[in-house]
Amino acid sequence: MRTVEVSAAPLAALAAELDEVAARRLTAGEERARRLLAGRTVWNVSAAEGGGVGELLRTMLPYARDGGVDARWLVLDGDAEFFRIAARLHAVMHADPGDGGELGPEEMAHYDRVLGANLEEVRESVASGDVVLLHDPATAGLAPGMRRRGARVIWRCHLGTDAPDGILDRAWAFLEPAVAQADRVVLSRPTYRPGFLEADAVRVIAPSVDPLSPKNRRLDPTAVSRLLADAGLVGGAAVAEQGADGADRPAEPADGAMRAGGPVPPGARTVLQVSRWDRLKDMSGVLIAFAEGFDELPEDVHLLLAGAAVAPHDSAAADVLDGCLEIWQGLEPQVRARAHVACLPTGDREHNALLVNALQRHAAVVVQKSLAEGFGLTVTEALWKGRPVVATAVGGIQDQITDGTNGLLVPDPTDLHGVMTCVARLLAEPAFAERLGQAAHDRVRREFLSDRHLLQYVDLVDELL
């Protein structure tokens, strides 16, 4: 395993974002955590440094360290076959067959062999009484070995689906021997609990967003315009981006950021979906819905689909992106002129996060047309920014949006007409859209910021120790 360095981030800065009651609760939780975990290490183990899990750890662990907790982050080592098995498990946990490969005895033997080697690397580091948080299916097989070391083990599964079937059963059959040995299992929704786990072994902890992270911190309109112009996402003169120290620095080159349609014109109202290039995010469905509802939309409305630049080895993402580009090519010329596809540069993690932040703040309406969703942090991010959101009622999106109160939900995730009807309503009723956006921001402040997330883990550790 390799170590990801974690620096402290001031909890006081997070507390300053909260109301007085929440801030006092956070301070009390900090003191309790320091007492509970004195002399212990909290190990977090993930399959990768990037992705949604990496983003959560990158924001949560610095706060824990500032609170006096020895929080550390380890990333698995593995060969290509191990990560193919992990990716297969990840897909199947969403009831998606993925690459269609096996999850049988040979795969189990390889999985256990790689994790055994990882366990050996930290044998002298993890002490009895430490707390180990294992994130997602790739790490679950470490639970028995960590328990033998005397650690208290929590398996945190960030995945799940509301429609369990035979595909999902394959993943649980593979994972059950290890997961059943964890002291506690943390899920994002109660409906994600498999039958072999008793209810008292499971805790439900929703993810959160950090209001001070590059993806979610405040950006004034000038900064939003500058970021989007620099990246070539919205038309306008490109200028240097201002770094965290206040000094100008060149933005990443915009070449290739727009894959279709060119920059969104300045002054256009943008309907945005920003997601991974993942079949279950249904970017192609959003594009088709826009085309089918095009005649009902005002002439100043443009669609922007934005995802991260596709890594050379990620054939699944490349297939989704290529499918969107093929659909775009087949659109009527007047629709193509108002539909845009972008791949956001990933060479600078902070810059990528700032671009997502700027896109969400720039959008007139944010869409999340997922076919399945574990929780849906892109929805949380847009809600935090006070944007009116149209999303499909799948997974954890249902726990974030109350239809007509802080967003609009489409019950059937395949309902293209329903999505565009909701979008058109928000564009036609700006006062209603603004009310939804304000309610959305307020709900995230109450329920989905880092303070609540941290305190729930303090409660969980208190149970175990």
Spans of features found by a protein language model:
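Catalytic cores of nucleotide-sugar-dependent glycosyltransferases that transfer UDP/GDP/TDP-activated
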Residues: M1-L465
